[in-house]
Curated annotation (Swiss-Prot):
Coiled coil ranges: none
Gene expressing this chain: METTL21A
Listed name of the protein: Protein N-lysine methyltransferase METTL21A
Pfam families: Methyltransf_16
Catalytic activity reported: L-lysyl-[protein] + 3 S-adenosyl-L-methionine = N(6),N(6),N(6)-trimethyl-L-lysyl-[protein] + 3 S-adenosyl-L-homocysteine + 3 H(+)
Taxonomy, superkingdom: Eukaryota
Length: 236
């Protein structure tokens, strides 16, 4: 689940989370994301980090050829949906080098805890064309639990938006990242640095991965960090 605190106490902040529908434009598609703050809380609203990470992917900052991606703590599923749409768009233009490329055989897996899955599935099904839905899987994943349902090193790209907040989840999240990553995998984490514990997680991450900040959105105060296993080459 997208584990972030609700900090916006102004009336304006409340209004944006209580809107039942938010509309975005990515990958030449109009995406309509349902929200349900009242019943599902933080897992069912679109956080700024998800918007910034989706924009970063659309910028073509990551190049993938015939590889697979997974979103952790997907919540509403915006990032995973955008990744899947970019996969479709890019597969239509295989000669376009500087964009996010997913070819046949690639797939996107969008994950969250069981309590959020039905809501997540509804957003994914509503926003992905039927012919690419078979390439997109919504799957339960509670960090640190039942990792055997995923093959070790299964994914080339691991995505997370505002998933580093609760300290009690840090060890499980690191264990999950370690399991899902191979030596060539790339992790992209988008987050706000709200508290010292957020920096503590990054320090923990650096013990197992090479970490660097690759993007900052000053308007939304969101950082994007890229991480790769330390025993791999610097370049993907």
């Amino acid at each position: 689940m997208a584990l972030v605190p609700y900090e916006e106490t102004t009336e304006f902040g409340l209004q944006k989370f209580h809107k039942p529908l938010k509309t975005f434009s990515f990958a030449n598609h109009t995406i309509q994301i349902r929200q349900d703050w009242r019943h599902l809380g933080v897992a069912a609203v679109v956080w700024d980090a998800a918007i910034v990470l989706s924009t970063y992917l659309e910028m073509g900052a990551v190049e993938l050829r015939g590889r697979s991606a997974v979103e952790l703590g997907a919540g509403t599923g915006l990032v995973g949906i955008v990744a899947a749409l970019l996969a479709l768009k890019s597969s239509m233009k295989p000669l376009l080098v500087h964009c996010l490329l997913f070819f046949s055989g690639a797939h996107v897996t969008i994950t969250d805890r069981k309590v959020a899955l039905e809501f997540l599935k509804s957003n994914v099904q509503a926003n992905l064309p039927p012919h690419i839905q078979p390439k997109t899987v919504v799957k339960e994943l509670t960090w640190g639990q039942n990792l055997g349902s995923f093959s070790p090193g299964e994914f080339d790209l691991i995505l997370g938006a505002d998933i580093i907040y609760l300290e009690e989840t840090f060890t499980d999240l690191l264990q999950t990242l370690e399991h899902l990553c191979s030596n060539h995998s790339v992790i992209l984490l988008a987050c706000r640095i709200r508290y010292e514990r957020d920096n503590n997680f990054l320090a923990m991450l650096e013990r197992q991965f090479t970490v660097r900040k690759v993007h900052y959105d000053p308007e939304k105060d969101v950082h994007i960090y890229e991480a790769q296993k330390r025993n791999q080459k610097e370049d993907l």
